[in-house]
């Protein structure tokens, strides 16, 4: 699934004359490699060139959370004394047109532009959304499973099987969340990869 998505996005990049795609926090990173970056002040970024294998630039402290997928992406972990922006800039050598994820922290974008003032920077969303908006049969099946689970809970809620009286909004939310998990729903099935 991830390899197919990478291949499709590289084809789209070539058709849009984009040399490289940079993805950080947000929904794109899990969609393409199955990993959701922690919203830290340390840079985690997937560098996808229009050809070749992508590279995930990640802080050492976050490295243990990554599921290795060596046929899909390389991992470049950086330590406290290393400059991750320089690692990304080096990976972009020769790139002119670069698309960056909408949820990338501004400070990382500014630092990258300081090092590479001649790149033509654009938003990645026009490319990534083309892929993310069209669901495969597997994705549709997973969405249907998630919807069925939530429908069961909604039915219990409508029939008074979930206690609401005397509960705070937070308590009701926690109970609904607990029941969603009990029904087999999880972030991976629901949001992160679909």
Residue ranges of predicted features:
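Flexible, acidic/His-enriched mid-domain "rim/lid" segments that flank
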Residues: 3, 53, 83-188
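Short acidic-hydrophobic, aromatic-tinged amphipathic segments that line or gate anion-handling sites
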Residues: 74-84
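Terminal domain-start leader segments
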Residues: 1-53, 93
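Conserved small/polar residues in nucleotide/adenosyl-binding loops
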Residues: 192-194
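Short, basic/glycine-rich phosphate-binding loops at helix/coil junctions
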Residues: 64-71, 154
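Short, hydrophobic beta-strand segments that form beta-sheet elements in well-ordered domains
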Residues: 21-23, 54-59, 98-100
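Conserved acidic residues
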Residues: 19, 73, 96
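Short, polar loop motifs at secondary-structure junctions
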Residues: 58-65, 103-108
């Amino acid at each position: 699934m991830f390899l197919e998505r990478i291949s499709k996005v590289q084809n789209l990049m070539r058709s849009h004359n984009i040399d490289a795609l940079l993805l950080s926090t947000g929904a794109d990173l899990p969609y393409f490699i199955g990993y959701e970056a922690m919203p830290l002040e340390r840079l985690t970024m997937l560098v996808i060139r229009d050809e070749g294998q992508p590279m995930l630039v990640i802080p050492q402290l976050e490295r243990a959370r990554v599921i290795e997928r060596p046929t899909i992406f390389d991992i470049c972990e950086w330590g406290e004394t290393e400059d991750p922006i320089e690692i990304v800039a080096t990976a972009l050598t020769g790139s002119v047109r670069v698309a960056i994820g909408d949820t990338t922290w501004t400070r990382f974008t500014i630092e990258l532009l300081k090092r590479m003032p001649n790149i033509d920077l654009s938003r990645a969303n026009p490319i990534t959304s083309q892929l993310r908006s069209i669901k495969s049969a597997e994705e549709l099946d997973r969405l249907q499973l998630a919807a069925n689970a939530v429908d069961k809970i909604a039915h219990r809620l409508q029939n008074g099987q979930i206690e609401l009286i005397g509960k705070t909004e937070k308590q009701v939310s926690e109970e609904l969340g607990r029941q969603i998990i009990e029904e087999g729903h999880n972030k991976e099935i629901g949001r992160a990869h679909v």
